[in-house]
Amino acid sequence: MLVGLVTFAAIPPIVTGPMIRGPIVFGTTYAGEDVDLTPERVTLVTSDGLELAAHWVHVHEPAAVVVFVSGTHGPSVTAFFGHAAMLAEEGYASLLVELRARGESQGERIGLAYDEVRDVRAAVAHVQTRLAYASVPIVAFGLSLGGATAINAAGVTPAIDGVVSLSAFSSWSEVFVDNMGLPEPFASVQRAFVDLYLGFTYGFDRRDLVPRRQIERLGSRPALLIHSRGDTQVPFASFERLAAHAPAHVETWVREGDAHLVVADGSFLRPWEDEAYASTVMGFLGRHFGR
């Protein structure tokens, strides 16, 4: 019994410790010019003093500003320049934010959607300093850990007017145990030890800062949850938990197969080529934020 508990306690730091060690150096990054954009490079400063690399894609009289954030170890948020180009065609501005400890952004530790909430809040604060974007709705759009961060940030940031989340986890402890494939009651025991590790690492005062709980705080704000049914990185159970806890009006779209990036293979920089995906995202934005 004691040996088993020690094993359960040892697994979270052994597995998660190396995963959260930064900074992450991306093998591939993209430029706005790859999709005929001329972005404005800016630096954001978080409430804990980190400088983050970010890229504006401006449009005239924007219908909304979409703040993009990416995943745990990639891709770089610059992969979303294609999304920004697609959105610009329909009158949406974009702010692409490289999360802490990744690429050109400062930081030494991946925050597992706890610390990264500060990054999204820094983006919101920056948008609010731009006179051209006064009173323009702000939409948080994230992939994987970025999707979890977008949900968490919306839960604690009333200035975020909407959310688009791709392949988000419902909580780190839940996706951790989902990927282990443990049956009950072992899964519950392991989750408890993962939560204990997260408390010591990120603070026990943040135990409610998880997407499954923060999505309940959306109120009437629109949100779109997207996931692939066979996702092997963030299993579909996370999507099911998020959908179960979301307000009734929250929209969902499920892609069959294992597609963690959701967009059809080879089309992430050109998302308009994936017509089903593009129409889902643009339809959601148009219904809630279009002119």
Q: Can you say where each PLM-predicted feature lies in the sequence?
A:
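C-terminal catalytic histidine-bearing segment of alpha/beta-hydrolase fold enzymes
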Residues: 240, 244-291
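Short beta-strand/loop motif that positions the catalytic acidic residue
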Residues: 218-219, 225-227, 231
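An N-terminal hydrophobic leader/cap segment in hydrolases
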Residues: 2-45, 55
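Alpha/beta-hydrolase active-site loop
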Residues: 111-131
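The serine-hydrolase catalytic nucleophile loop
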Residues: 72-86, 99
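Hydrolase active-site cap/lid region
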Residues: 152-204
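Conserved alpha/beta-hydrolase "acid-adjacent" motif
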Residues: 232-238
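Conserved alpha/beta-hydrolase
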Residues: 86-106
